From Swiss-Prot:
Keywords: Iron, Lyase, Manganese. Its EC number is 4.2.1.8. One of its GO terms (biological process) is D-glucuronate catabolic process. This is Mannonate dehydratase. NCBIfam families: PRK03906.1 (NF003027), uxuA (TIGR00695). Its cofactor is Fe(2+); Mn(2+).
Amino acid sequence: MKMTFRWFGKEHDTVSLDHIRQIPGVEGIVGALYHIPVGEVWPLDDILELKRQVNEKGFHLEVIESVNVHEDIKLGLPSRDRYIENYKQTIRNLAKAGVKVICYNFMPIFDWTRSDLAKRRPDGSTVLAYEKQKIEQIDPEEMIRRIESGANGFLLPGWEPERLKTIKPLFSLYKGVTEEDLFDHLRYFLEQIVPVAEECGVRMALHPDDPPWSVFGLPRIATNKENLDRIVHMVNSPANGLTLCSGSLGANPANDVPDIFRHFLRMGRVPFAHVRNVEIHANGDFEETSHRSCDGSLNICEIMKALHEANFQGYIRPDHGRMIWGEQARPGYGLYDRALGIMYLLGIWDSLENEKKKQEGEKTCSRSIQV
């Protein structure tokens, strides 16, 4: 298991690589190019510059999150082929820079969706939260305004202004698009890009929908075990993988998250995992919590056990953290609580390793980065 940390770059992040270096056990950075419009080719020189910055601090850059998919591809428009060709070239360029895993999603229009970016918890921390009634009572444009006003001036992943300024025309285009249509459009995309990923030694890793149900009447398909199983069998290749996100899938209590992890780990289709916790309320609303099992509705210990039992050799990162200790940062992506999350996840992992190896007298943790 390779522990990583998402970083938004010098221009977009309050968290520095020097601070990340001080978190024990972090080996790599999960990064992206945020100045390239969705659908355009990522230039190799820009990728190499990001890699240089990351390598300079002793980290690897082997996971990219995300190379977003243009809406024309999701809609199945005739113009999709141009954007698919651009996507292929981006895969090739990332592979040349040593990238092994590309995370992406196939959610129409919106990426992750929340009603609140700073809901106050009983302990005084603030978290991302989803209240169904709030979402149902506002139109998409109002939600965009609320998200932007609550973002503390930061660019939020999946909420790129150049895409969202065309919100009304996009909703018109999606009128009548069904889940089956979206499955067909994803299949077309995968049939084109997976062979390129295979040639380049890259694994594509689809992120589940967040939350895993329809929002504003838009179709969503990466929502449960059955649908994800259908997706990985569309193109039966190890390069057609998943980013299993416990918090996204776990927002629906019908999803048995440890079982989902075990199922796809057995298939060898999990190159990347996001592990975080959520607290689900009786009415179906949810809010994010610390990573600790007893603080939310998910059994994080059992999820980590599933990864350990599978001898997971892929990449993992903590996900959305609380805002704690007065930190001012991008909602969900501060330093402190994600660092606490890492130590919790590594503590579980070390305990499992110790149980496995206690008769062998081996040490259970790897050394921190030395530069």
